[in-house]
Amino acid sequence: MSMLKNINTEKRNPRSFNLDSMSVQESVNLMIDEEYGVIEALKEQSLNIAKIVEVTSQALKKGGRIVYVGAGTSGRLGILDAVECPPTFSVDYNTIIGLIAGGEKAFIQAQEGAEDNPDFGKEDLLKINLTAKDVVIGIAASGRTPYVIGALEYANSIEATTIAISCTKQAKISSYADYNIEAVPGPEVLTGSTRLKAGTTQKLILNIISTLSMVSVGKVYQNLMVDVKPTNEKLVERSKNIICEATGVDYVTAQDFYMKANKSVKVAIVMILNDCDYEQALAILKKNNNFIKS
């Protein structure tokens, strides 16, 4: 019997046995209903997720990086999360990194066999000069991807912190990691298509890890992204609105301080809250480890 048969992500969903003969409305309703399994899976793993947020937060505070490693959908989700962090939080592109089996070209076109070689996982970590300060997060819905296992093995060998995220219980990759999340949303509507519920589950976990890790290092004030990088017109307007929300000033005043603060939302807020100039605001932030304290 194939080893895959016993993995949660490969099991058939009895509710969708007749998917090919359902009406469009029936199948739409089914796919929506099946997503409830995602939230239940996350709730069941909430303690593990919280622990991992603590781990990644500490790593960032000590100058370490978060490195996502995955193949196929899992790898693409890691990249999606990583590339959104620089514009949202003004972190360096090397702070949170997404690696995918087969390299960047695999993001848009599958690279056959790339995920089956554990050495490729190690090689990709060598290319980014992984250190013991970093955290490697291996992502594999099936919990058995050789590329991810190779990466985790190498990370362990240099004493980097390792985390495994899978969508099956007793996942193989869990045994290669210091911490693990085994969030099981149930069999897919389309058997084995882990871009569906498993992919959604993984994406939500990564959302939580990256967002709350950024909160822990002062990138958020209240629930405002005060380190947003205003790289387009929408984000420039959002920046001014954030200043208004955080300080209670009107739009014109926010716009004025935005310019005085060299287009830094965080600095503008500190200037307003502390009634100080640009240089004084920078000093206050440095003293407070880049946190805004009202």
Curated annotation (Swiss-Prot):
Transmembrane domains' residue ranges: none
Any one GO MF annotation of this record: carbohydrate derivative binding
EC number: 4.2.1.126
Pfam families hit by this protein: GKRP_SIS_N (PF22645)
Functional note: Specifically catalyzes the cleavage of the D-lactyl ether substituent of MurNAc 6-phosphate, producing GlcNAc 6-phosphate and D-lactate. Together with AnmK, is also required for the utilization of anhydro-N-acetylmuramic acid (anhMurNAc) either imported from the medium or derived from its own cell wall murein, and thus plays a role in cell wall recycling.
InterPro entries in alphabetical order: Etherase_MurQ (IPR005488), Glucokinase_regulatory_CS (IPR005486), MURQ/GCKR (IPR040190), SIS_dom (IPR001347), SIS_dom_sf (IPR046348)
Keywords: Carbohydrate metabolism, Lyase
Family: Belongs to the GCKR-like family. MurNAc-6-P etherase subfamily.
Record-given protein name: N-acetylmuramic acid 6-phosphate etherase
Reaction(s) catalysed by this chain's protein: N-acetyl-D-muramate 6-phosphate + H2O = N-acetyl-D-glucosamine 6-phosphate + (R)-lactate
CDD domains tied to this protein: SIS_Etherase
SIS domain boundaries: 56-219
NCBIfam families named in the record: N-acetylmuramic acid 6-phosphate etherase (TIGR00274), PRK05441.1 (NF003915), PRK12570.1 (NF009222)
Pathway the protein contributes to: Amino-sugar metabolism; 1,6-anhydro-N-acetylmuramate degradation; Amino-sugar metabolism; N-acetylmuramate degradation; Cell wall biogenesis; peptidoglycan recycling
Active site: E84 (proton donor), E115
Native source organism of the sequence: Francisella philomiragia subsp. philomiragia (strain ATCC 25017 / CCUG 19701 / FSC 153 / O#319-036)
PROSITE patterns: GCKR, SIS
GO biological process: 1,6-anhydro-N-acetyl-beta-muramic acid catabolic process; amino sugar catabolic process; N-acetylmuramic acid catabolic process; peptidoglycan turnover
PANTHER family tied to this protein: GLUCOKINASE REGULATORY PROTEIN
Further facts: A lyase-type mechanism (elimination/hydration) is suggested for the cleavage of the lactyl ether bond of MurNAc 6-phosphate, with the formation of an alpha,beta-unsaturated aldehyde intermediate with (E)-stereochemistry, followed by the syn addition of water to give product.
Assembly and interaction partners: Homodimer.
